[in-house]
């Protein structure tokens, strides 16, 4: 009697026998062997709750590897197999491998879902990965390899505004590449949508990184540095250059804003454990807003079409991938975040306006205009050109193309890169600001 092979204990596909201590298919066995042999360190963007099945097994490598371990696969079996072919350099004392605990910039597993129900969300995810790698170069103010680990630092307002100024064009590039319909919109309508989007995105992304790192006492910046909310003097301090307001008065006036951001955005996102696809959904709903002053009917209709599409995709994600028992309630809890986000945006706008009126500290004109609802006429002619010197552009080309195939617009195995170059500040890390 012929006995059929058992299914893979990781993904449920037809098995190929016992591998490393558990029943597994060839794909999962090869994945486990490669992960252990190359000492891979994966990070899940969905709080370790991804479903691993044969049609979505490649979606999250972190959860796939965790499941390999939970079903009984042994790292030691891979190690013994490797030693048959030559002893590895096991000198732990020399050149230790740094394992960063932060989730930013994120090492993202390329999405490979066979069912075509999340086209826009997948596109956003891939382009966000690309943007994260470009950020490593754009915001690299030091010397040496951009993938070498560096300790994040608490920054002052001048550094934070410099980061956000670089982000204006970079985020616009992400939007243009991710939404084909955005290119079809009239120039003035593009500016209208984007200036309504950038500040909410900036705050949303900060909440998303706080959610990933499970802490809300600091505000993560796209550069990998942070604003230390518990020590506002590192952000304002003695750098206030105003005759109308002392540094102490500035701290008393603006520190309550940190509490507003935390209460309205950071804590709710952390409580709901918002993952990457939910973050992209919120971004999409903010971008494709309607009822804006000056918005024409054609733009309104296109915005409605894109909102409906992204809502269908997130519901598909809830039902088919996450397999949430009550997708409607989960989506409702997600949408409740949007009014609170707008309260934080208004507070940020008020703070910037106060600093401008009282000349508390200088704000770059481009950033102030965006906060005030203005963009230059030629913004989208130059937005896709990254704000970088020719030398930086060469570095971007050298470092980024190794993980992004410009011909196919697909991620090329990000996990062949060294570990991410940023470390999460710990409670014991002194919050020093480099000036």
Curated annotation (Swiss-Prot):
Residues forming the NR LBD domain are 113-374
Listed GO MF terms: DNA-binding transcription factor activity; RNA polymerase II cis-regulatory region sequence-specific DNA binding; zinc ion binding
Disulfide linkages recorded for this protein, renumbered to the chain, are none
The ranges of region (Disordered) come to 84-106
Cite the entry's keywords alphabetically: DNA-binding, Metal-binding, Nucleus, Receptor, Transcription, Transcription regulation, Zinc, Zinc-finger
| Superkingdom of origin organism | Eukaryota
Zinc finger regions (NR C4-type), where?
A: 8-28, 44-63
InterPro entries according to UniProt: HNF4-like_DBD, NHR-like_dom_sf, Nucl_hrmn_rcpt_lig-bd, Znf_hrmn_rcpt, Znf_NHR/GATA
In the UniProt record, which is one GO cellular component term?
A: nucleus
Where does it live in the cell? Nucleus
Repressor as a keyword of this entry, yes or no, is no
- Renumbered to this chain, the Polar residues biased-composition regions fall at 91-104
UniProt record, GO biological process: regulation of transcription by RNA polymerase II
Check the record and name the SMART domains matching this protein. Answer: HOLI, ZnF_C4
Q: What does this protein do?
A: Orphan nuclear receptor.
Name the protein family: Belongs to the nuclear hormone receptor family.
Descriptive protein name: Nuclear hormone receptor family member nhr-28
Q: What organism is recorded for this protein?
A: Caenorhabditis briggsae
Kindly list the organism's lineage.
Eukaryota, Metazoa, Ecdysozoa, Nematoda, Chromadorea
């Amino acid at each position: 009697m012929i006995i059929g092979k058992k299914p893979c204990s990781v993904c449920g596909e037809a098995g190929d026998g016992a591998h490393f201590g558990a029943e597994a298919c060839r794909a999962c066995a090869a994945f486990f062997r490669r992960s252990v042999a190359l000492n891979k360190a994966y990070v899940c963007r969905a709080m370790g709750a991804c479903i691993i099945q044969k049609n979505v097994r490649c979606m999250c490598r972190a959860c796939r590897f965790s499941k390999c371990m939970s079903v009984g696969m042994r790292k030691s079996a891979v190690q013994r197999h490797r030693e048959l072919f030559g002893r590895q350099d096991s000198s732990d004392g020399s050149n230790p491998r740094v394992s960063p605990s932060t989730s930013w910039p994120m090492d993202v597993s390329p999405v490979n879902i066979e069912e075509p129900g999340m086209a826009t969300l997948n596109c956003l995810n891939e382009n966000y990965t690309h943007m994260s790698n470009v950020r490593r170069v754009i915001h690299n103010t030091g010397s040496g390899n951009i993938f070498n680990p560096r300790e994040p630092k608490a920054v002052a307002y001048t550094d934070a505004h410099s980061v956000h100024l670089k982000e204006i064009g970079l985020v616009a590039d992400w939007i243009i590449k991710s939404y084909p319909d955005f290119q079809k919109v009239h120039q003035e309508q593009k500016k209208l949508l984007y200036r309504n989007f950038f500040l909410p995105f900036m705050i949303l992304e900060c909440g998303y990184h706080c959610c990933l790192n499970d802490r809300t006492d600091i505000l993560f910046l796209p550069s990998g540095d942070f604003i230390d909310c518990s020590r506002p003097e590192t952000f304002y301090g003695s750098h206030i250059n105003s005759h109308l307001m002392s540094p102490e008065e500035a701290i008393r006036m603006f520190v309550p804003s940190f509490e507003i951001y935390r209460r309205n955005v950071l804590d709710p996102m952390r409580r709901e454990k918002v993952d990457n696809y939910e973050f992209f959904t919120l971004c999409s709903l903010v971008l494709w807003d309607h009822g804006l002053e000056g918005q024409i009917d054609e733009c309104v209709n296109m915005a409605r079409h894109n909102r409906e599409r992204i809502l269908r995709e997130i519901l598909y994600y809830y039902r088919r991938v996450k397999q949430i028992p009550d997708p409607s309630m989960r989506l409702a809890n997600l949408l409740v975040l949007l009014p609170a986000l707008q309260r934080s945006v208004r507070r940020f706008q008020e703070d910037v306006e106060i600093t401008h009126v009282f000349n508390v500290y200088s704000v770059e004109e481009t950033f102030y205009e965006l906060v005030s609802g203005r963009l230059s006429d030629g913004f989208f002619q130059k937005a896709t050109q990254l704000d970088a010197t020719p030398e930086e552009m060469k570095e971007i080309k050298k470092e980024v193309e190794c993980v992004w195939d410009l011909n196919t617009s697909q991620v090329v195995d990000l996990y062949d890169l060294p570990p991410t170059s940023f470390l999460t500040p710990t409670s014991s890390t002194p919050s020093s600001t480099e000036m």
